[in-house]
Amino acid sequence: MWRSKNLRALCDRLDLQLVVKAPPGAFADAGAPLARLSKPVEAADEDALCACFNLGSDRDFRSDPCFGLIVLSEIASKALSPGVNDPGTAIHTIRAIQRVLHKWSVTLAEKADEDTDPEDQTQRVFLPGISVRHALECGFDPISFDGANRPVITRTLLSALSGLKAQDEALFSAQADELAQAMLA
């Protein structure tokens, strides 16, 4: 996770641009750069920039949005296990994932409206977004696998994907269709 306000302030002060290469929750490989700078900086400034990143061995909901989808998906998968056999909880969890993804799409739309200032030529920090495909896979793939032999789960998953498409066709349509086709294959 990064602290974008701190990054922006530092980049403003140093008059540079910074491109973050890894999305939140990504595995940070010691051999791969976390970010690229538009120009070299002093060691102290490099340390200050590095301090804006939160690296650790554990994922958390605040800094890694897809982690929340994964945890919800694991709850549904556990509910579908033979020892638990609780499809109602799995269905409830699928709907919770749908609500989370819908809220995300609304937030993205609001953010896009805020970011359309043609006068702002001072963007300093470029952060990677979370892909729709990745979000849908984190939320629905494990449930689809574990619930493949349960028509009620497949119907609920397809209904959730259809609902997401209806709520934001431009954002969800292509990936939701691909995931639905994979579920039915």
Regions found by a protein language model. Give the residues of each.
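Short basic (Lys/Arg) and small-residue
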Residues: 1-16, 23, 32-185
